[in-house]
A protein has these predicted regions:
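Extended, charged catalytic domains and RNA/DNA-binding interfaces, predominantly
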Residues: 1-330
């Protein structure tokens, strides 16, 4: 996702979708304009463009917007819909002259989730996002809608966001996106102001390329994130096998009624209750560039680091690496 000239960016929304499909060669994208800049006319235009560019089995467009409340109100959230012609619930009308639908505003992230629930919009999927106003998931989160944390974009890398979620016991997926403002979704590069990183990509594990399948994938957290660029289209397959019977869920049973089924195997994104026995996890990683290391975490705890080389193969060169956010935010 990203933005275009109608909100805060360059090139039109029409050119934005064309770039994603024809230049970045991504399979799916969404447009996430700051809500306080989205007029009702532009909201209708985005619906029209979603219909124009949507083509089953070739290119999927997810209607949506960025709920753009300040961090003190909950911070940025990406909101995606399964259909067009939906009610946009803005954080404010700050830059919109037409105030006729001011009563639909949700001034906090908690109010947004409450409004979605009150109106039974269970098909909506939200991501916690770090853009102009980083998300505070400890202040507001609703697992019925907010399925994932965005850990990388053109703004930088934000592993602390998913760490916050794990500290709170949330069961969430991980995504990465462009969020550039130059109209280049899927191929966003540094070069403007605070956008100092290559935009990220998300691999979506689905059987078919349709909007329904993509939304189902997002709800079930069957995806993973990369930091984009030349090595950003790696293939990762994760399978867990149990030596006893387990109960598998797609929805978190801790936050409400959830249908479970018996299983001896699980895939990426599944929630599993496994009271006894042991589990074996198989991970396959295919990468277009050499792999430096694979870190395996259990929540916040680093369990093991795997390096595909031996000490003798290192040679006599020293590599100096530094990483991590300079400060909480972007």
């Amino acid at each position: 996702h990203g933005q275009s000239e109608e909100s805060i960016g360059t090139n039109s929304a029409d050119q934005y979708f064309a770039f994603a499909r024809d230049c970045a060669f991504v399979d799916a994208t969404g447009h996430q304009a700051n809500d306080f800049q989205v007029t009702n006319g532009f909201w209708s235009d985005l619906d029209r463009l979603a219909v124009k560019f949507e083509e089953a089995d070739k290119f999927v467009v997810l209607p949506g917007y960025e709920w753009s409340g300040n961090t003190g109100m909950g911070g940025d959230r990406n909101v995606y819909y399964a259909t067009e012609d939906r009610q946009i619930r803005r954080s404010s009308h700050a830059l919109i002259e037409d105030k006729s639908d001011l009563d639909t505003d949700c001034n906090t992230a908690a109010e947004l989730f409450e409004a979605l629930a009150d109106n039974k919009e269970w098909d909506v999927v939200c991501f916690a996002h770090c853009g102009g106003r980083y998300a505070d998931v400890k202040m507001a989160h609703d697992g019925r809608f907010e399925k994932s944390m965005e850990v990388h974009s053109s703004w930088g890398t934000f592993e602390w966001l998913v760490q916050d979620a794990f500290e709170m016991g949330y069961r969430v997926g991980i995504v990465a996106n462009s969020d550039g403002h130059k109209g280049r979704p899927g191929a966003s590069y540094p070069g403007a102001s605070l956008f100092g990183a290559v935009g990220g990509l998300t691999c979506l594990l689905t059987d078919e390329l349709t909007r329904e399948a993509i939304m189902d994938c997002l709800r079930k957290r069957r995806h993973y994130a990369t930091t984009g660029g030349l090595g950003g289209r790696m293939v990762i397959d994760v399978t867990a096998r149990f030596d006893g019977d387990a109960t598998l869920y797609h929805d978190d049973p801790k936050i409400g009624p959830a249908e479970g089924r018996s299983a001896t195997e699980a895939m990426m994104g599944d929630i599993v209750h496994f009271p006894d026995g042991s589990a074996e996890i198989d991970v396959d990683v295919l990468c277009p560039e050499p792999i430096e290391r694979i870190d395996i975490f259990n929540g916040l705890d680093l369990v093991e680091t795997i390096r595909p080389y031996t000490q003798d193969e290192l040679g006599n060169r020293i590599r100096v690496v530094w990483e991590g956010a300079e400060y909480r935010g972007r």
